[in-house]
Amino acid sequence: LESFFRNERIEIVDKALPRPGVVDVLKKLKDNGNNIYIVTARTDKHDDMPYERAKTWLDKNGIVYDRLIVGATNKVKVCKELGIDVFIDDQLNNCMKISQSGITTIRLTNSKEEYDHVVNMSNFNQIFEYICSLK
């Protein structure tokens, strides 16, 4: 069963498409002088090559980035070590932890629920405008 799950999950992830707008927005942010760090908790529990698979997917889909960090079970620590000043995620739990550490946090969601120090945005064009307004 574990082998089946691993193979099916890998196939599904490999075929997934990026969210609308993410490729263009990350390129514009990079062109504006921002560093782009991809921080994922993905580990080898269900994938024996998490870094390689993530890198292949990002490159295949034209997503620009400066550094890819996999296996980041403590994203707050990683963000602090890298000096990240804006964090984007769709997982509320991650957003809450990061925002409590003082990092500007954007949650990609359609939810109308509000949380202290977490900015909800529903698409990457909104995110781009918001980040530009911070400078």
Please report, for each region that a protein language model flagged, where it lies by residue:
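Structural recognition of alpha->loop->beta junctions
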Residues: 55-68, 117-135
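A structural signal for isolated positions on well-ordered beta-strands in alpha/beta enzyme cores
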Residues: 35-37, 67, 86, 106
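Structural motif corresponding to alpha-helix initiation and N-cap regions
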Residues: 19, 23, 72-76, 92, ...
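Short, acidic loop-to-helix structural element flanking the phosphoryl-transfer center
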Residues: 6-38, 46-52
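Anion (oxyanion) recognition and catalysis
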Residues: 27-30, 59, 99
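Short phosphate-binding/catalytic loops that engage adenosine nucleotides
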Residues: 34, 63, 103
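Substrate-recognition "cap/lid" segment bordering the active-site pocket of phosphatases
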Residues: 43-86, 92-96
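Acidic, Mg2+-coordinating phosphoryl-transfer loop and its flanking beta/alpha structural elements
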Residues: 84-122
